[in-house]
């Protein structure tokens, strides 16, 4: 069972991937509104669960178990997507699958160690990430152009921000200590994403901010006491560490769903097959990888939404019986 501090640290560390890797290219308005929507959705889900694990609450009945199985597959696909995004930490070698395969291998190994071990790792990483990103945001303010901070983007950008900031909500599938709020961490991540998007657009211009790994470009021109500092190596490391936490969180959620379906531990053959399939998947050409993970993620997202429907339906039935 995850303690409150470790769960909060794991949620925020995992949320750094969409907050600083994806949302800066979507505009600060889209990041803020999408993040607020994601936090609201997770808050409503937490209220429906009443402290229970989403995996335990949903895996009841044939329909719920079928949706849980599809959700587990979708979470595995999202973990592969998160590992694949690790390539963007090194734009010059973005075509190499080595970083993605390494992050997936480490995440798979960490997920086998349990949520407590991953939570301890996130509790150590979170202060380092907060200081690093905070320094870049603060010292980039002197380069902002107010004319570039006008709201830009489309409703689609807000939807993308909402979907990406929902990923740390995978912590709802884990067993957590009472009083742990995943939506609170998501709300903080939404504010960080909006700040990163505003700094990126105000420094690079809105067209420049639309490029991939735009925040990494901002880190290359940070000036401290009149001297240009090169933070891109540190940012690349931070992106890898947060990608590791997100990938591990998604794998832990998938494992929790499978354990709720089959209380007995999965065999070594199943784990080895999943590990081998993931590595082969990540070594595919990049367009095919993202296309396949996209389809899997969409199926998993639909199944997760259906799980929420099952949970809310079971809750209403119990309320009627108690009445």
Task: Tell what function each PLM region has.
Residues 3-21, 30-42, 68-71, 99-106, ...:
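Hydrophobic, membrane-embedded alpha-helices of multi-pass small-molecule transporters
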Residues 3-6, 73-84, 127-152, 201, ...:
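Hydrophobic alpha-helical segments and their helix-loop junctions in multi-pass secondary transporters
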Residues 17-100, 104-105, 304:
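Membrane helical hairpin/interfacial module
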Residues 25, 262-268, 280-299:
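Extracellular/periplasmic helix-loop-helix junctions in multi-pass membrane proteins
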Residues 46, 85-88, 103-125, 176-180, ...:
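Membrane-water interface regions at transmembrane-helix termini and the short interhelical loops
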Residues 61-68, 72, 125-140, 188-198, ...:
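Small-residue-rich segments of transmembrane alpha-helices in multi-pass membrane proteins
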Residues 78, 82-85, 97-98, 110-140, ...:
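Membrane-interface loop-to-helix entry segments
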Residues 204-232:
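Membrane-interface interhelical connector segments
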